[in-house]
Amino acid sequence: MSEIALTVSMLALVAVLGLWMGNWKIYGVGLGIGGVLFGGIIVGHFAQSWQLNLNGDMLHFIQEFGLILFVYTIGIQVGPGFFSSLRVSGLRLNGFAILLVLVGGLVAAVVHKLFAVPLPIILGVFSGAVTNTPALGAGQQILTDLGSDPALVDRMGMGYAMAYPFGICGILLVMWLIRLFFRINIEQEAQAFASSLGNQRELLHTMNVAVRNPNLQGMAIKNVPLLNGEDIICSRLKRGDLLMVPAPLEKLELGDYLHLVGKRESLENARLVIGEEVDVSLSTRGTELQVVRAVVTNEKVLGSKIRDLNLKQKYDVVISRLNRSGVELVAGSNVTLQFGDILNLVGRPESIEAVAAIVGNAQQKLQQVQMLPVFIGIGLGVLLGSIPLFIPGFPAALRLGLAGGPLVAALILGRIGSIGKLYWFMPPSANLALRELGIVLFLAVVGLKSGGNFVDTLINGEGLAWIGYGALITAIPLFSVGVLARMVGKMNYLTLSGMLAGSMTDPPALAFANGLHPTSGAAALSYATVYPLAMFLRIMSPQLLAVLFWAM
């Protein structure tokens, strides 16, 4: 068998064995995707024992490309909500996440100096203790740039593997200890979160209002500021027994009924100006009007503002609301359309059909991946990651690297959504497939490289000490920040659990946190809020530690 064929076969064997091991559960907790690392260690151990020669250049390429795929797809997934997550409560949650990362880096630095642990080893232990694989890749890259011994750089994977198991279990233990320490009642926490969410979330509401203000008599709808802004949509008008779509030039009459869509405060302001709220049905049932949902899939309208489509004048159709990534928005005239937006259309059937054709409404396109933007994004990310950042006094330039560059590029492109006919929307199933493929390839190679000396290091070397260092790096930041967030920040326990899982970028911990209460979405919401920034900081922190301690 050729060297390349043997290398591919070994990678496939590692993936099969590792994914199988990852499915093992002990009290509901498993290694998950981390099982691939240990599958690689096992195969790597026997590969060295049997003197099998694998292609080093091929392994290096697969490792780096797998890492790029993983971080890029993460960025595309969370990009649309990343910047908005930094507002309001997101600032508070991300503040604790930043503190947790800083404390973890501080503990790693203290262990490095106190116990004279070699820099590559402590960076590997640090990455494993926080269960962050891209951090391992970033640490290996910066050490290579600094001129570290390649053999020592490869030993980072062993440090990672030693610390990883307690990294997975340690966060679950900390969640349990905090719950025990504060005597927390999960049901009460879920009810408190639901109550606070109801007060904070600005959902869209509807209101039927009768025109009673004589000043509006004979005034065209387009001339009524409240009905022509960005906060309220007037989707239906009823005059007598006639229900119609209100055209901009339609003149209001006293006694008209308007169906308004918007936020509660805006609707109350409109009611005060227009007249009074009435309990009158403006349903389209039994009329010539329909309400139909259509999804934006036509590249020609991507980036267009709703007003540019001129739907009211041309087709007598109004967009009553817009759903983007599960969030309902007021369909104001200045809203820019993005791929995958779901529009609520109100109008006659033939008109709605024409508008649906304009916006696309091709459901099958939501399951297709536009590959050109994927490689444009990866290319831009690699270029961005290669830009050196020179800081006075540092022995080497900092770079976002192959882990940080594609992540930042994907976050920005995911937020932009589309440029011309190019769109960065990726179906969840495709995103998950590419992400899992990337992390499996990366971990498989790391495991293969580490496996040759793993058993000897664990039994005869410093493996047990590395496990202890990893336990300190895992537990101290989690417990200290968790207690601080609960005592000082008065943070809801379910929200706290999700924040801890997101700060560690740890999906198994999120699964555990979600299982604390079957119906509350508190943990998932806080996890998603802190995950993007935490991932970015996790990638940068080993680079900063490497540069700071390289010359010391």
From Swiss-Prot:
This is Putative transport protein Spro_0050. The lineage of its organism: Bacteria, Pseudomonadati, Pseudomonadota, Gammaproteobacteria, Enterobacterales. InterPro entries: AAE_transporter, RCK_C, RCK_C_sf, Transpt_YidE_put, YidE_YbjL. One of its GO terms (cellular component) is plasma membrane. Gene3D superfamilies: Regulator of K+ conductance, C-terminal domain (3.30.70.1450). One of its GO terms (molecular function) is monoatomic cation transmembrane transporter activity. It holds the Pfam family TrkA_C. The keyword Transmembrane applies. It is found in: Cell membrane. The chain crosses the membrane at residues 4-24, 26-46, 65-85, 96-116, 117-137, 158-178, 371-391, 393-413, 439-459, 464-484, 493-513, 530-550. Belongs to the AAE transporter (TC 2.A.81) family. YidE subfamily. GO terms for biological process: potassium ion transport. It is a multi-pass membrane protein. Its main location: membrane. Residues 192-276, 279-361 form the RCK C-terminal domain. It comes from Serratia proteamaculans (strain 568). It comes from the Bacteria. Keywords: Cell membrane, Membrane, Repeat, Transmembrane, Transmembrane helix, Transport. Signal peptide: none annotated.
